[in-house]
Amino acid sequence: MMKRQIFLTLLAFALPALLFIMNATISSRDERSCDISWSYRNAKFAIEGTAFNEYWKTILDSLSLSGDCHSKISPKLAPIFVSAFSGNHLSEATHMLSSFVSYFAEREDKRTLIVYDIGLTRQNRRQLNHYKIHYGVLVRRFNFTKYPDYFRNLLEYRWKPVIIAEVLKEYPAIWWLDSSAIFANKSVNIQEAEKWTSERSVQVTLFENSSHSIFAATHPDMFRYFPVPVNAAKTLTMWSANHMLFYATDSVRRAVLRWWVLCALERRCMAPRDAALSCSFQSDRMNFYADCHRYDQSAINLLMALASNFGHNSYAYPYQKPIVIVRRA
């Protein structure tokens, strides 16, 4: 009887500690849990896309995109700006850089600009020194060796979603600018767009209407991965990917970035066989396929359509005044 009483007394003291340790272990494991589905499921129409290769998990891990892991970045930091270009786009890129400097010159709200080198020569990089030294522009080289060889085909734009994902590991929000994007005028208040985006359920905003449907400029094979019904794709306008705003929220990582990066990694998702950039539009730019493909832009539009339950008002910026305009050299 005495031994039994001693045992029960010890158990009464030990059990709470044991439960605490078990709960802490389970909690720790749950926080690290990064289970991932490898095929996109369209819940509205009960359609499942072609599965991506699980080989890409290591890269997803490196970009914090493997599952439901929570972002540790402070949301209080203002969005920074990110761009990327090769030497053949340096001329238009210098206009973009100058417009960025001019726009923020008289503003108290200073912002960081990171430029990714995706094919600059030594001389090209020297030409950027002016912006690095005087305006704090940061220049990074994109590490192509971490990714499949076909990333080096710059016209397939696989590098764009990966660069955006890389930077969103460090910063809570980013503006993406193509090298051809320049600020339209100094009176535009980007903070209005940032506030609007931060209030969305999936905090990604596209800004420029392309005046044709997603269907018209998306290779049919991409729909195998992101199962949007053809009739829906014909009614949805494609929005340009030349300037976009992203917040590093869990919903953005799960619903958009993870799949966008997977598409970039999967050879025939981002660039289906026989895909071509040049379009042959008919007078009806919504209901007829223009025999072309917009690569990263097609993918982000499909993903945003799916994430918003096919309501572009959730991600297409509603105000008419342009934030940037595109001027290609």
Locations of the language-model features?
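Glycosyltransferase catalytic domains, chiefly GT-A lineage
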Residues: 2-329
